[in-house]
UniProtKB/Swiss-Prot annotation:
One protein family per Pfam: Sedlin_N
PANTHER family: TRAFFICKING PROTEIN PARTICLE COMPLEX SUBUNIT 2
Biological process per Gene Ontology, one example term: endoplasmic reticulum to Golgi vesicle-mediated transport
SUPFAM superfamilies linked: SNARE-like
Top-level taxon of the source organism: Eukaryota
Organism: Dictyostelium discoideum
Leader sequence residues: none
Similarity comment: family membership: Belongs to the TRAPP small subunits family. Sedlin subfamily.
GO cellular component, one term: cytoplasm
Protein name (record): Trafficking protein particle complex subunit 2-like protein
Gene: trappc2l
Lineage: Eukaryota, Amoebozoa, Evosea, Eumycetozoa, Dictyostelia
């Protein structure tokens, strides 16, 4: 059973760059709920005291908030790109594993957006990126 239900990357203007659901039994209603959860987490990231720090060690924001079914975790880069993952509430995940996952996800994002054909601050539509993220999800 996969622990990660959704992975989202949001730009500095709070525009979605990448949102992907990873639950095989997700309905359209649940998909909409996940998008809503990701959107709500943006306010929490902005209000988080650590979100204004510039140190690389402070990029991991930890648990943003729990819902009935999910836990939402965040990661904020120094360029204000937000990485958000939604996991099942029943999942017991260590912070060290989450930090490693976010760093790997950020590396994939950097490699993809470093492409000269990528238009900055636009949706990531690369099939290769989607496949790499899909391969990364079971590692948590």
């Amino acid at each position: 059973m996969k622990k990660i239900v959704c992975v989202a990357i949001v730009g500095k203007g709070n525009n979605p760059l990448f949102i992907q659901d990873f639950s095989s039994s997700i309905t359209d209603e649940n998909k909409l709920k996940l998008h809503y959860i990701v959107h709500c987490s943006l306010d929490i990231i902005e209000d988080k005291p650590g979100s204004n720090k510039k140190l690389p060690s402070d990029m991991y924001l930890g648990l943003l908030y729990p819902t009935e079914d999910y836990k939402v975790y965040g990661y904020l880069t120094n360029t204000k790109i937000k990485f958000i993952i939604v996991v099942l509430d029943t999942s017991d995940i260590k912070d060290s594993d989450l930090k490693l996952f976010f760093k790997r996800l950020q590396t994939l994002f950097i490699n993809t957006t470093s492409n000269p054909f990528y238009k900055p601050n636009s949706k990531v539509e690369s099939k290769k990126f989607l496949q790499e993220v899909t391969n990364l999800v079971p590692s948590l």
